[in-house]
From Swiss-Prot:
Identification of the protein by name: Multidrug resistance protein MdtA
Record-level Gene Ontology MF annotations: efflux transmembrane transporter activity
HAMAP family: MdtA
Any single Gene Ontology cellular-component annotation: efflux pump complex
InterPro entries: CusB_D23, Multidrug-R_MdtA, RND_pump_MFP
Keyword field: Cell inner membrane, Cell membrane, Membrane, Signal, Transport
Amino acid sequence: MKGSYKSRWVIVIVVVIAAIAAFWFWQGRNDSQSAAPGATKQAQQSPAGGRRGMRAGPLAPVQAATAVEQAVPRYLTGLGTITAANTVTVRSRVDGQLMALHFQEGQQVKAGDLLAEIDPSQFKVALAQAQGQLAKDKATLANARRDLARYQQLAKTNLVSRQELDAQQALVSETEGTIKADEASVASAQLQLDWSRITAPVDGRVGLKQVDVGNQISSGDTTGIVVITQTHPIDLVFTLPESDIATVVQAQKAGKPLVVEAWDRTNSKKLSEGTLLSLDNQIDATTGTIKVKARFNNQDDALFPNQFVNARMLVDTEQNAVVIPTAALQMGNEGHFVWVLNSENKVSKHLVTPGIQDSQKVVIRAGISAGDRVVTDGIDRLTEGAKVEVVEAQSATTPEEKATSREYAKKGARS
């Protein structure tokens, strides 16, 4: 009985072992059939391909760029507003009825162009009266001078007294004074008549008219007839931090005009290029900034008064600078660093000293050299000494994207 009992247990154990072996055989066959051909081939080519769990994982894909040596312009940037070089409110200098306007709203005018006319009738009358009085007094003077000549002859023979001669001399002098006053009155009346024709005091663009024809206007009107803004040239007033003052002053001492660029509100389109005109004479204590004025020819009317723009002033150009994409520059506990690729596509961390930069590129003053390859994308997957796969970045495919890329390359860097 005891031998048969043991035999039954042996049979049970053998059956269990056979079942387990059959299960593992079936499971391994399914894994083999479901494996991708590429993965199978990679496993066969791998030195450890015959051992489960020892196959190497795929390399981390990254994008890279080469550090280049180039001249990098240094810009100071600020926000500003376009202002007219001159703004003039055209007012009448005499009182009267507005008879005519000789401009179109928004028109460009030259200094001296006729803008408006006031009824000249009263001024013509006043001029005629002054001229008449002058003629009358000139006749009186001529008569007084003739009498004086006679008195002088009679005085020689004592036919007139010395007192009478002096009185006649005084009359002549008085009449001469009257003549000068009359001449001034004529000039004043002529000036009043001239002022009835209102002309442009400066070159510029006229705005909207402030008064209609037929209205009575006076020299005391505050609104005036029209406002002229001088836009050729035109100015840009922007602010810089007080820390930039020394840089601007040093650049001015070089003797060359400092170029100032005006960019649109989104800082994506260059509107015009001018030169630095002046610095303000004091710092705004509230904001810690100083006002700067630049002047633009604006012959294409790209700039308009009160327009908001981004200002960029070129103060220096750094020659032979090592430049990399800004995306490659990282910040860690030890400071700024970049991941550098060697010839085997293995990465290593290099501490660097950055210089001037913008959103596209950064100058590296120390830590790498021109020709070094740095990782620009896929940085979060990197570890020291890891081998990576370098893939190409997706390039600009449309003309607009290419143009934008070229424009960023021209814009340079800022401090």
